[in-house]
């Protein structure tokens, strides 16, 4: 049954009143489906108001789908048709409350990748570096990914031990001013109350972020990239651990190994290898962070926040198969119009996977059944790409071009619906081109395991005007 968010002929008047129509459809109890029309209402009804930004849009969007952070939502009285009887409804309900939570596919079959981007933003980041900033913001549904299905409208925390102290307050938000890859990151703010308890010097909480479906007895690898933003009160120490817990409460996780890596710009990466040992076929799990705080002054409140820049889960490759290296094989440029004085055309490229050189071959006879390489890589072991960053760099003279680190980001794949192409227009380039000038275009991929290809695995093409 259809519900129009604009309220055209819909019971409840649309907008934040959509819940009134959906409550009659009752999809969870009656098994009926809901077709929701015009969800862009959250932007289109407010976009012309002074001071309206993508951050304010997200607050409005979050209220419609997940509910307010606190308090109630005041709604105008819904219009009624002539002769329509009054229909009394309870307080506001977010749209997500009418439908069961469905986790993403098993990351063993489809690797999970999230940079907590809703498909809009103000800037673009590559490995923590802002490579682009827009005056009016940008939109690209190809870059939309999970924003964490367990942190809205606010995270639900629990202690890691048996204590019964008051839990810290937690707030979630999207940060479009700082990110690791993409256009935004997930901001988590924690406020620990003052405590006189003897054990309050060390407090550890569990913060679930994303639900997943995992198959038992399979090996997975997960990594999270985060940045701590310290508060302004007093000194404290923090410890972070990436962890998983079953939603049912049965803790059957077997974490085989953990590692921590310091990245640039204040970012850090946590990586774990894990499996589930239960007898069931699969489990619905929550992936999140265990945050421990150590302070010498627990009798004073403590506030801090952290940014979650990226979350990835994928199959763990056996050591015997860690030999496939993804690369961009070639890049090409085709002009839109032949002999045009302006640069206008399409970049295309192709990807490949290479095997390393064989150091020792012990094939003793033509009948030897052991191959030099592993010749049966599965789909889950073959890397693929989420998107590609495109860079441009003008030649300094007829023969020379500067180092690749001087190249300027000009966009990504996907905005035109194509995974391995990019349209180039001279007026969109961030530098001036003169006749007979050459430009080098670089293609750099982001794999589905969250890794940006090093430049020696990327491709480029030179284009002359």
Pin down the residues of each PLM region.
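Extracellular polysaccharide-targeting segments
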Residues: 292-338
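Extracellular carbohydrate recognition and processing domains
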Residues: 249-282
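Extra-cytoplasmic beta-strand recognition segments
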Residues: 205-240, 270-274, 311
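Beta-strand-rich modules
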Residues: 390-394, 419-465
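Extracellular beta-strand ligand-recognition surfaces/modules
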Residues: 224, 269-311
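Conserved aromatic anchor
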Residues: 330-333, 340-385
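Short carbohydrate-recognition loop motifs
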Residues: 169-204
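Substrate-binding cleft of secreted/luminal carbohydrate-active enzymes
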Residues: 3-168
